[in-house]
Amino acid sequence: MGQCRNWKWGLESFDFSINRRSSAPGQLESASQMRESWRHKAGRRMFSCPEESDPIQALRKLTELCHLWLRPDLHTKEQILDMLVMEQFMISMPQELQVLVKVNGVQSCKDLEDLLRNNRRPKKWSVVNFLGKEYLMQESDVEMAEIPASVRDDPRGVSSQRASSVNEMRPGEGQASQELQTLPRVPALSRRQEEDFLLPETTVMKSAPKALRPKPTLEKDLNVDREENTGLTSPEPQLPNGPSVVGAKEGKEPKKRASVENVDADTPSACVVEREASTHSGSRGDALNLRCPKRSKPDATSISQEGPQGGATPVGNSESPGKPEINSVYSPGPAGAVSHPNGQEAKELLPFACGVCNKRFTCNSKLAIHMRSHTGERPFQCNFCERCFTQLSDLRVHQRIHTGEKPYTCDICHKRFNRMFSLKCHKRSHTGEKPYKCKDCNQVFTYRKNLNEHKLIHSGEKPYKCPKCLRAFRRPETLKYHQKTHQETTAPRECEG
């Protein structure tokens, strides 16, 4: 019988999916059309085929009922598919989720998915005894916690049989507390009862008697829910002694409640923390800074900055070297638009400075890797050719030359590469992309290396010199070819040019 009641509830709660559809674009169905649509739907649900009946006639009858319900002459294939999927979804879901879907007026699977995704956070539900019947309702925690005494003392026909009527449940999980599981099934509401009772739910809850008031433990539940909603993972810091802390110990709500009560359910957690932090100052503000969600770090970029010469010294927090200050983390901006700060701001965001070239870094590990370029240290050695590298990642890429491993494949010509960067550059031969442009002559190149060599033509620089004849060249390949001329002759000869 429990499954039967749940089945009926699912049918009636999904009645809106047909009645709210328009028979013509821009027109709502009339009351007679709504009743007719529901009659055909109910007839299809209650259809049964006796054993002695003709199965062909039963098939035709069932086809006719489904046609009258789905109306393929008025609805599209997507609408019909949504109707079938949502009906089965409503039949198999718990009652509290059926109420949530019906109150929000969901009419398509896409809207239903958005509703379920946005309602995964903990909600408060209550069982209300009204006119001898019990109803499952969703309520506002803060509004229930602050109902005026003059309003609470007026029962106005609401029964006070349930002393603890507020029970936590998660609609996305479809689980209720033990008290809700022992209650009888919520009766199906007609359309008129739904409009008279479910819609003005705040009015009914404001007039609730003392039996429906939250107990003092509700304050603790509200705090737990708010911490879960904001998604804070860091532990709560120990607050210093102050008026707000003393008021909280005595059972009084601190003033921060005023800044959280008016926050909408869809407000991002970061905005809630920022709004809460803006109402405090002094030591309380410092404590709230520790609760802010972790911001994204800047890219692995270094900024050249004038600084004192010497060893690698972190700038910023002198008490805890190797860790930047929490308050110095900046708000993340749009991807690809990271601005490079200067001066004091650069020291706060990039606290670790190189004492040789004054480049700055976000963490000490990146600085240690950079210092190897000055000291010449190469701690990672290849087991095959004994070649050394400054980073372990470079060693792993190099070892693919010996092992023949090429994990990256071009999806166009199926050519394989041992580095992702090589594959990225190779794809430009298929797409014709030339992202590097010369500022002097507007000539474009496929690779940065070719652009750098081209710039030497405009500057006239020749950085590669022959150690024997001191002749200079722009490209290293040309220098190697030139050096072969010295090896071919036993006696060195004077180079021309």
From Swiss-Prot:
MF term (GO), any: zinc ion binding
UniProt keyword terms in alphabetical order: Metal-binding, Nucleus, Repeat, Transcription, Transcription regulation, Zinc, Zinc-finger
ZnF (C2H2-type) ranges: 352-374, 380-402, 408-430, 436-458, 464-486
Main location: nucleus
GO CC aspect terms: nucleus
Region Disordered: start-end pairs: 148-342
Domain SCAN box: 41-123
Source organism of the structure: Homo sapiens
Compositional bias annotation for Basic and acidic residues: 216-229, 249-259
Gene Ontology BP term (one): regulation of transcription by RNA polymerase II
Pfam families named among the record's database cross-references: SCAN, zf-C2H2, zf-met
Protein's recorded name: Putative zinc finger and SCAN domain-containing protein 5D
CDD domains recorded: SCAN (cd07936)
